[in-house]
C-alpha cells in the first residue's frame, strides 16, 4: 500500500498488517510506503499539508510492527530521493542534509515460506536503499573536515612563508628610515 499507513490509526494499521499476513501466500511480500519523517522538511512541514494524515509514522515503528505481528523479515528502503544525492560523492551542502534524506520510505515485509523461495529474495533484503540523515550528515562532516585540514595546511605554509620573509622585513626597515 502506497501512502496508506500514515492515514490509519495504530489499531487499523495493525489490523491491515495482520490481514496482509493472513492472506499472503507463503514467502509473499507486503509493501507499505509512507512519508519519511527522518527527512527534516517532510517531518516538520510537508507531512502536515495533508490534513488526513493521522500522525508521523517512523520507519523503525513500522518495521517493528510487521515483525511483531508475525512477518519473518522486513527491510526499510528510502525512496524518491534526488538522483545527484544518491551518488556517493554527491552534493553535501547543509541544505542537502536538512532536506535530502529520502522523502519517502517503504517497509517490505516477507511472510515465512519455504527456504528456497525465501532465499530468492535475499538479494533484495541484503541491499541498502535510500539516503538516511546519518549518511548525509556524515558526508557533510567529511567535507567540512577536509576543508578544515586544507585550512590548517595553508595556515602552516603561510606561517613558514612569514618566517622566511622575516629577514626581508628587517632590511626593509633599514631603507624606510
PLM feature segments, named:
Residues 52-54:
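Donor nucleotide-sugar recognition loop
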Residues 70-83, 94-95:
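Conserved S-adenosyl-L-methionine
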Residues 62, 91-98:
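Short, P/G- and charge-enriched loop/turn segments at secondary-structure junctions
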Residues 101-107:
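Short hydrophobic/aromatic beta-strand or adjacent loop that forms the aromatic wall/cage
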Residues 37-39, 79-83, 112-115:
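Short, solvent-exposed loop/turn segments at secondary-structure junctions
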Residues 43-50, 89-91:
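Short glycine/proline- and charge-enriched loop/turn segments
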Residues 1-43, 56-68, 109:
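Conserved SAM-binding loop
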Residues 108, 112-177:
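Boundary detector for helix-to-coil junctions that initiate low-complexity/charged tails
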Amino acid at each position: 500500500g502506497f501512502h496508506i499507513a500514515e492515514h490509519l490509526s495504530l489499531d487499523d494499521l495493525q489490523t491491515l498488517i495482520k490481514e496482509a499476513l493472513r492472506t499472503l501466500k507463503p514467502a509473499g511480500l507486503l509493501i507499505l510506503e509512507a512519508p519519511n519523517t527522518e527527512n527534516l522538511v517532510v517531518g516538520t512541514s510537508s507531512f502536515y499539508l495533508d490534513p488526513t494524515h493521522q500522525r508521523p509514522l517512523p520507519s523503525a515503528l513500522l518495521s517493528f510492527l510487521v515483525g511483531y505481528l508475525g512477518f519473518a523479515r522486513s527491510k526499510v528502503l528510502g525512496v524518491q530521493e534526488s538522483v545527484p544525492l544518491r551518488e556517493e560523492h554527491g552534493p553535501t551542502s547543509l541544505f542537502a542534509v536538512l532536506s535530502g534524506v529520502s522523502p519517502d520510505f517503504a517497509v517490505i515485509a516477507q511472510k515465512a515460506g519455504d527456504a528456497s523461495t525465501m532465499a530468492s529474495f535475499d538479494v533484495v533484503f541484503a541491499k541498502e536503499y535510500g539516503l538516511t540523515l546519518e549518511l548525509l550528515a556524515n558526508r557533510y562532516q567529511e567535507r567540512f573536515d577536509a576543508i578544515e585540514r586544507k585550512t590548517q595546511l595553508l595556515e602552516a605554509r603561510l606561517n613558514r612563508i612569514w618566517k622566511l620573509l622575516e629577514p626581508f622585513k628587517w632590511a626593509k626597515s633599514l631603507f624606510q628610515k
